[in-house]
C-alpha cells in the first residue's frame, strides 16, 4: 500500500486523494453506493439525482446501475446509457451516445459541441420534463441494443464468409 494512503469501504484513497478501485463494484453494491451518494448530498442535488434515478428505472426496469470512475453512478443496458454526475451547482446527466439521439424536447443543454456525448444540466429549482427524459432513456437503450445486434450479425456474416 502507498505510504500515507488510506482505505475506505469504496476502495483505496491514494496520497493525492484519488479513489482507486481494486475490483469492479457488483450491481447490488453499486446501488448501495448510489443510495449513499444521494444521502451524502442531502440537498437539492440529492433529490434531483434520486428523481433522475427513479425516472431511469421507470423508463427501463432492466437497466443496470454501476459505480465507475472514482464514484460516478452509471446506468447501462447493452452499453452505457448515461451517467449521473453531481457538481456544486448542477446535476449532470451525460448520455454516452447522445449525439446520435433525437431530442425533440431539447433536453440536451450541455456538451453540445461533442461528436458523441450530450448532457443535461439540471440546476436547483428546475423541473424535469419526465416524459421527455424517459423517451430519451428508452431511445438510448434502443440505440445500444441495435448496435449490439448489428455487431452480432456482422460477426456471423464474417464467419460464414471465412468458411
What is each PLM-predicted segment?
Residues 1-163:
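Charge-dense, helix-prone N-terminal extensions
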Amino acid at each position: 500500500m502507498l505510504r500515507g494512503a488510506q482505505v475506505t469501504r469504496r476502495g483505496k484513497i491514494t496520497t493525492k486523494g484519488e479513489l482507486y478501485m481494486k475490483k469492479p463494484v457488483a450491481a447490488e453494491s453499486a446501488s448501495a453506493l448510489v443510495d449513499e451518494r444521494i444521502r451524502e448530498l442531502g440537498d437539492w442535488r440529492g433529490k434531483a439525482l434520486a428523481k433522475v434515478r427513479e425516472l431511469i428505472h421507470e423508463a427501463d426496469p432492466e437497466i443496470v446501475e454501476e459505480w465507475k470512475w472514482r464514484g460516478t453512478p452509471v446506468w447501462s443496458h447493452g452499453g452505457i446509457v448515461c451517467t449521473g454526475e453531481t457538481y456544486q451547482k448542477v446535476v449532470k446527466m451525460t448520455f454516452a451516445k447522445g449525439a446520435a439521439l433525437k431530442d425533440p424536447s431539447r433536453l440536451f443543454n450541455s456538451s453540445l459541441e461533442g461528436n458523441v456525448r450530450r448532457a443535461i444540466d439540471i440546476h436547483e429549482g428546475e423541473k424535469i420534463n419526465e416524459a421527455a427524459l424517459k423517451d430519451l432513456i428508452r431511445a438510448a437503450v434502443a440505440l445500444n441494443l441495435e448496435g449490439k445486434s448489428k455487431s452480432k450479425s456482422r460477426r456471423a456474416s464474417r464467419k460464414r464468409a471465412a468458411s
